[in-house]
């Protein structure tokens, strides 16, 4: 069984055509996940305009104990699903490489553009969603010094001189 988590109907249709060999289920919100029915599924997540990280959605996915998770994202987030095997791929992956990845064959999957820790991605997502510093500190339960440390490291990784340049960053749509 394949669970396709996306808000993009064109993406889902393409995945359904590629994965025609199996049972393909379209998931748009966390209420549609059935922990018993979808147990041990193969999960494919599209994060374009659908940032499911750091939400109950990801907790639900972890409970499914999926066989493998493929995430379409320019971000490689270290240990985002604990011990669940995760592969990050860009949306520009060749169909032949994607099919090889699904079948468990070796393929040269391009590396993600940006590699972040879970906490860095969480801070970045909060900043991209225009949360105030105080709200971020309260939500993430971190100190101001830790926040500025993460913010500085994120700016270095993304090559930003000022944090307001994030609004024009090429990957901003993967954070909201």
Curated annotation (Swiss-Prot):
Query: What does the entry say induces or represses the expression of this protein?
Result: By acidic conditions. Could be induced by EvgA via the induction of YdeO.
The record's annotation in CDD domains points to: LuxR_C_like
Q: Which InterPro entries match?
A: Sig_transdc_resp-reg_C-effctor (IPR016032), Tscrpt_reg_LuxR_C (IPR000792), WH-like_DNA-bd_sf (IPR036388)
Residues in the DNA-binding region are 133-152
Pfam families linked to this entry? GerE
The record's SUPFAM superfamilies line, in alphabetical order, gives: C-terminal effector domain of the bipartite response regulators
Enumerate the GO terms in the molecular function aspect: DNA binding
Q: Which UniProt keywords apply?
A: DNA-binding, Transcription, Transcription regulation
- Domain HTH luxR-type, by residue range, is 109-174
Biological processes annotated in GO = regulation of DNA-templated transcription
Record's function text: May act as a transcriptional regulator of dctA.
Protein name according to UniProt: HTH-type transcriptional regulator DctR
Q: What is the lineage of its organism?
A: Bacteria, Pseudomonadati, Pseudomonadota, Gammaproteobacteria, Enterobacterales
**Name of encoding gene:** dctR
């Amino acid at each position: 069984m394949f669970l396709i988590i996306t808000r993009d109907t064109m993406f889902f249709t393409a995945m359904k055509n590629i994965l025609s060999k199996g049972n393909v289920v379209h998931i748009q919100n966390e209420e549609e996940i059935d922990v018993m029915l979808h147990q041990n599924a193969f999960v494919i997540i599209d994060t374009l305009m659908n940032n499911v990280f750091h939400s109950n959605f990801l907790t639900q996915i972890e409970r499914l104990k999926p066989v493998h998770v493929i995430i379409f994202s320019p971000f490689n987030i270290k240990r985002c699903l604990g011990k669940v095997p995760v592969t990050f791929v860009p949306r520009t992956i060749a169909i032949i490489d994607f099919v090889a990845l699904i079948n468990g064959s070796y393929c040269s999957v391009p590396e993600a553009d940006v590699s972040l820790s879970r906490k860095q991605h969480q801070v970045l997502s909060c900043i991209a969603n225009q949360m105030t510093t105080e709200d971020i500190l309260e939500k993430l339960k971190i100190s101001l010094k830790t926040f500025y440390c993460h913010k500085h490291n994120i700016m270095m990784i993304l090559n930003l001189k000022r944090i307001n340049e994030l609004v024009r960053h090429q990957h901003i749509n993967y954070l909201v």
